[in-house]
């Protein structure tokens, strides 16, 4: 997450993020082989109308982890994600290269890929306790790398969102004049269903078939955002 500070009406600097989001069918091999990887577990203590407060744990240096299959009969209400969280915390204590970071973020709704986002580190134990008590969690592996001149992040979701891959292009200013890469199937920047706070409550496994039918009917779509 890259924050850019903009000056508000009262002269104070306000943090914003600029990103565009795309549905991806398959994780590019370059991302798996050359991207930096982290595993993310997060929950939303508030999410309504596009506004959200998020608590996140980011695990780095864990290596490639193959998550077990999600079983809806027993893994509902965050049981799967909390189980994986416990395993990640245990593994992070024994892996020499592992590190864990806890953060809390406040977000506004996104308009054309621009939104307010303020993120700070928080106490690890407090973050763990919040996540362990949360029913709606998001679990994903994130691969970050440069594609041409842009930084990209590929989120490969697990648990109740298993099968979903989303790519995000972030800049320090509005993402305009973007050369759409081949891996981008269609743009979902303006589709609220693909926000993580929405995926925590209405996961991919509840509407993936509907989305694929919509995509087949209308075809790919990309925002035409150009510099002035």
Regions found by a protein language model. Give the residues of each.
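Phosphate-end processing signature that detects enzymes handling 5′-triphosphorylated RNA
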Residues: 2-228
